[in-house]
Curated annotation (Swiss-Prot):
It comes from the Bacteria. It comes from Vibrio vulnificus (strain CMCP6). Part of the 50S ribosomal subunit. This is Large ribosomal subunit protein bL31B. The keyword Ribosomal protein applies.
Length: 86
């Protein structure tokens, strides 16, 4: 690797705010916030909304179920215009 062109790779604490879960992962992410971890060391800190702890694919749970499809929504919105017969 060429020296001086690659970002610093280090451990970063990610906080999944939707389920209040913390985990440490190696990353090149740059942040000004820090947090003291369980091992007593200070790491960069970054908040996220979705991770493997909260994503429906990994948890097997659906959060929001869409009641209508896009076509049904379109038909409902534009039904008032009726159909034109030529």
């Amino acid at each position: 690797m060429k020296p001086g062109i690659h970002p610093e790779y280090r451990k970063v604490v990610f906080h999944d705010t939707s389920v209040d879960h913390y985990f440490v992962v190696g990353s090149t992410l740059q942040t000004d916030r820090t947090i003291e971890w369980e091992d007593g060391q200070t790491y960069p800190y970054f908040t996220i909304e979705v991770s493997s702890e909260s994503h429906p694919f990994y948890t097997g749970k659906q959060r929001v179920v869409q009641k209508e499809g896009r076509v049904a929504n379109f038909n409902r919105r534009f039904a008032q215009f009726g159909s034109r017969e030529g």
